[in-house]
């Protein structure tokens, strides 16, 4: 991984073979980013996406084999207790220009992953929400 500090965050380039979520979450934790936002593009392998069913309160997960263009990744960082959490959604396109998207659980860098992390400058916590079954941001 390579990175450069900016006035309000970091530009990060993940290398071939890096697991995106693990690499970026560790980067945020190592740089004490306790809240922030992330956007990115690139080319990834074997993304695993999820769709949250609000009725069953469970994720349907699906792994897509092969390489895909990362058309757009957007998300955020927060804390769950003392642990840094990355929550992001992503859209991918295949060789036929079909687009798939959802909650990103995992993906490996195929060529490059280029990301901009904006540090929030504060700590945002997540906590279980009984209504949705999700770990939501607590902003009070």
What are these regions (language model features)?
Residues 1-86, 91-140:
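N-terminal intrinsically disordered, cationic/polar leader segments
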């Amino acid at each position: 991984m390579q990175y450069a500090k900016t006035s309000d965050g970091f530009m990060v380039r993940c290398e071939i073979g890096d697991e995106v979520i693990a690499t970026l979450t560790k980067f945020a934790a190592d740089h004490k980013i306790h809240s922030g936002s992330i956007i990115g593009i690139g080319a990834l392998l074997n993304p695993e996406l999820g769709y949250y069913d609000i009725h069953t309160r469970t994720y349907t997960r699906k792994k897509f084999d092969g390489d895909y263009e990362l058309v757009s990744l957007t998300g955020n960082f927060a804390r769950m207790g003392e642990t840094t959490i990355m929550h992001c959604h992503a859209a991918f396109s295949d060789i036929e220009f079909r687009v798939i998207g959802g909650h990103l659980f995992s993906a490996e860098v195929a060529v490059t992953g280029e990301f901009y992390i904006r540090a929030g400058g504060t700590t945002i916590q997540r906590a279980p929400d009984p209504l949705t079954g999700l770990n939501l941001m607590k902003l009070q």
